[in-house]
Design a protein with these regions (language model features):
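N-terminal lobe/hinge region of extracytoplasmic solute-binding protein
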Residues: 55-110, 139, 222
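Gly/Pro-rich hinge or "lid" segments in bacterial periplasmic/extracellular proteins
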Residues: 92-93, 97, 188-256, 260-261, ...
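Extracellular/periplasmic solute-recognition and catalytic clefts
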Residues: 141-146, 151, 161-162, 230-240, ...
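Detector for C-terminal structural segments
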Residues: 33-41, 79, 233-237, 241, ...
Length: 609
């Protein structure tokens, strides 16, 4: 399955023949020079020694076309990786703590958040990383609303980014919200760009962001991370270790990352990744592999079900701008009709705990204190109950017409035929396709006229953010972050950035709870504003319980299953030293991905291929 990680409140890809494939190169003829990061004539495939090359998967489908760090759609390793561009800090979801990266320290106050940049941090061209680079990066979001850092400004979370001194950057919080959580999330997710490189390019583009984004930036990428782009083709992308990486001395006592090359082969399907992992041609991946316990030589975080750490909730998002999806009775009927056990056991191979109603993870040690089993039992609809689904349909005045046991149509209370509800999902995302098929089968059996609609991923993303759908499948806030679970509720429920169909938004994708519309529930936005400022734990539990209760009663989205942040899987045929639940020195994130980047310094060649 292909999955692209997105910055959601500021707002993941996959797939093996033998991975030692030739690539185009424009300048250098082989990987011998650490300083080269050019793309694309042919280099000898044998040049990449197996004991020097780590093969990763799950973050790239299709021929690479864009390495621009400001683009909304980027190729590996720019897309959510810390290999070339780095974030201010990283987040450890196992411990719920921030970890230094470009910023060596941070300070959260009632009206501001400050980050002090490590004086040792350098770009790979030798220039220092300074507060000016950080300020410039986030100021771009103020200037251009299409960039991923813009919601800090458009959401009115900050009013200013200023330099306290050359190495210290202070984000001034909006005086009415005083919400530091989105700033901390941004510090984890937004990769800092070099002002001395990007600003002249922006000027050359006439300060037009659309013109700037036409530059795919596949040559001489100036980043602060431990690797450089070496070469790419339609078959693979290769990065090469920067032996002068500033973090070697700061974090690892001068030690270099173990792999000289980190390579992402480009394949057609999850099946290819499965074969690659089993044969040892791919070392680690984040792709969905069904029945991982049956895959020879392939390991995961846990050695028994659910194998992966559940951290997200894939959902169906009804477009409440259109009838009948604006009817809460229909939405609750849809929720009751779904066979969640089939989804968990068949579609996702048991990689999930049983689903509970609401948007709080009841098994997560950091947020289970906010979950109320009593409320879920009394008010929740995320359980398979066909009779309850039919009762909700009846209350809403709907009539289902069957012939020979098959649903023919559904009529509303006026007797008018209800248009077939299409559920949109990307083609090729195999686990999502399976989920949607189970959902459609369940809904039709309960009398709800729904059909699947699988579309190309390039169309999916545009439709998702402009509300061009009846119902769409999407996972909000995929990466765990400092603001969890507040951010999950904010992305689903917030009316602060509500927009009509056709306008791009990264939150409230179903356009629920229009602040200027009838039936606006003001308490939702009140709670979303209050929770980040609550210090008393008992009051925080109370506030989350109320917010979760509102969600369950109104069912603006339909949670389907719990899912891993990423399907962290690996084989130790060529490299050893991956973290697991039995040895959790780092979280279950593939090398190069966020804090998982530090796995690269713990790996050792296995002495195999």
């Amino acid at each position: 399955m292909v999955r692209r990680p997105l910055a959601s409140a500021l707002i993941a890809l996959a797939c093996v023949a033998v991975p030692l494939l030739g690539c185009r190169k424009h300048k250098n003829t082989g990987p011998a020079s650490t300083g080269s990061n050019q793309s694309g004539s042919s280099s000898s495939p044998t040049a990449f020694a197996r004991n020097e090359t780590l093969y990763v998967g799950g973050r790239q489908w299709g021929e690479p076309s864009n390495f621009n760090p400001l683009a909304g759609w980027q190729d590996w390793p720019v897309n959510s990786m810390n290999l070339i561009y780095e974030t201010l800090v990283m987040y450890n979801p196992v411990e719920g703590k921030l970890v230094p990266l470009l910023a060596e320290s941070w300070d959260v106050k009632g009206d501001s958040v400050s980050f002090t940049i490590n004086k040792a941090a350098k770009w790979n061209d030798g220039k220092p990383v300074t507060g000016e680079d950080v300020k410039y990066t986030f100021d771009l979001g103020k200037q251009f609303a299409s960039l991923l850092m813009s919601p800090l400004w458009t959401g009115k979370y900050i009013t200013d980014v200023k330099l306290t001194d050359p190495q210290t950057v202070t984000f001034t919080l909006d005086a009415t919200k005083k919400n530091a959580l989105p700033v901390l999330d941004a510090a984890v997710e937004i990769r800092i760009v070099p002002k001395h490189v990007i600003e002249p390019m922006m000027t050359a583009a006439g300060n037009n962001i659309d013109e700037f984004l036409k530059n795919k930036m596949d040559k001489e990428l100036v980043g602060s991370g431990p690797y450089k782009l070496l070469t790419y083709s339609s078959e693979k992308i290769v990065t090469q270790r920067d032996d002068n990486y500033w973090g070697n001395a700061v974090f690892f006592g001068g030690k270099l990352a173990a792999p000289k090359f980190v390579t992402h082969p480009i394949f057609k399907s999850n099946d290819h990744f499965s074969v690659g992992l089993q044969q040892g041609n791919v070392d680690t991946s984040a792709s969905f592999l069904p029945r991982i316990q049956e895959k020879k030589n392939v390991k995961a975080w846990y050695d028994k079900p659910p194998y992966f750490v559940s951290a997200t909730i894939p959902m169906l998002w009804p477009n409440v701008l259109q009838a009948p999806l604006d009817d809460v009775h229909l939405r609750r009927a849809m929720a009751f009709s779904i066979n969640y056990t089939d989804i968990r056991e068949l579609a996702v191979s048991g990689y999930s705990d049983p689903l509970e109603s609401g948007m709080i993870l009841p098994f997560d040690k950091l947020e289970n204190k906010y979950f109320s089993a009593e409320d879920a039992k009394q008010f929740g609809a995320s359980r398979y109950d066909v009779e309850a689904a039919k009762a909700e349909l009846k209350t809403g005045g709907y009539t289902s017409v069957f012939k020979d046991g098959e649903l023919v149509e559904m009529k509303d209370k006026s007797g008018k035929k209800v248009p077939t509800i299409t559920i949109k999902s990307p083609t090729g995302w195999t686990d999502w396709e399976s989920i949607v098929k189970i959902v459609v089968k369940s809904m039709r059996a309960a009398g709800i006229d729904a059909r699947e609609k699988f579309v190309d991923a390039s169309l999916f993303w545009g439709d998702l953010y402009t509300a061009d759908f009846d119902v769409i499948m999407f996972t909000p806030t995929a990466p765990p972050s400092p603001s969890t679970p507040w951010r999950r509720f904010d992305v689903v429920l917030s009316g602060a950035e509500w927009a009509p169909k056709g306008e791009k938004r990264y939150k409230n994708l179903g356009r629920f709870n229009n602040p200027k519309g009838p039936g606006y529930i003001a308490r939702i936005d009140e709670l979303l504003n209050e929770i980040p400022r609550i210090k008393d734990e008992a009051e925080l539990v109370k506030a989350y319980r109320e917010l979760n209760l509102i969600f369950m009663k109104n069912q603006p989205t339909l949670p389907l299953v719990y899912r891993a942040d990423q399907f962290y899987e690996f084989t130790e045929q060529a490299w050893k030293g991956f973290p697991t639940a039995a040895n959790p020195f780092l979280p279950p994130q593939m090398p190069g991905d966020r804090l998982g980047t530090r796995i690269l310094w713990h790996l050792t060649p296995a002495g195999g291929k």
